[in-house]
A protein has these predicted regions:
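Conserved small/polar residues in nucleotide/adenosyl-binding loops
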Residues: 157-164
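Divalent metal-dependent catalytic cores for phosphoryl transfer on phosphate-bearing substrates
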Residues: 62, 68-156
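Hydrophobic alpha-helical segments, chiefly the membrane-spanning helices
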Residues: 170-173
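Acidic/His-rich, divalent-metal-binding segments that scaffold phosphate/diphosphate chemistry
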Residues: 1-94
């Protein structure tokens, strides 16, 4: 019997080895609403990027919206646009390895190629500025033979404040 979980409904075990089928059925009933709420949680987390400029010309939310808008206007598919939107969602939680956060969120839903691009966009962007901060701008070359290297190296949407020469309807602020 499947039903919505109640707040009081809990598994009885304290160690996973002691879980029963009923315990796991209870946990499963709690998991479904959690999984179904992912989009709302990601959008709420994106809003945390508002006002966080990090020294850039626009805040991180505006940058994310601009990036997704450019991808949409370029005719990219829905998965690509979503990846463009969430590519920096991890900035607040994990600034050093933020690309891995967005990539982990979308991994079950997008192609291996899009997941790879999202997971590696940070090291590829490093090409444009790492030499200014004492890092190896060519670190991305470790992936030169990877089939998605060229797709990730593309500069189409990588600027903190992307400017579209074609008269985009990009938001200038969030």
């Amino acid at each position: 019997m499947s039903h919505a979980p109640t707040g009081a409904e809990r598994a009885a075990f304290h160690q996973m080895k002691d879980g029963t089928a009923e315990d796991w059925a209870i946990i499963g009933r709690h998991f479904q609403p959690l999984a179904e709420g992912l989009t709302d949680r990601v959008l709420a987390h994106l809003k945390l990027l508002a006002g966080d400029h990090g020294g850039f010309a626009v805040d991180r939310l505006t940058h994310s919206l601009q990036t997704a808008t450019l991808a949409l206007e370029d005719g990219r598919d829905e998965d690509y646009v979503v990846c463009a939107l969430v590519h920096d969602v991890g900035d607040v939680l994990a600034p050093i390895n933020h690309p891995e956060i967005g990539a982990a969120i979308v991994r079950p839903y997008v192609s291996e190629k899009l997941h790879w691009i999202l997971a590696h966009h940070g090291i590829f962007q490093g090409y444009y500025f790492w030499h200014h901060i004492g890092l190896d701008r060519n670190a991305r070359d470790a992936y030169r033979d990877h089939p998605h290297f060229e797709a990730c190296a593309c500069l189409l949407y990588t600027s903190p404040s992307p400017r579209d020469q074609r008269g985009s309807r990009m938001p200038s602020s969030a």
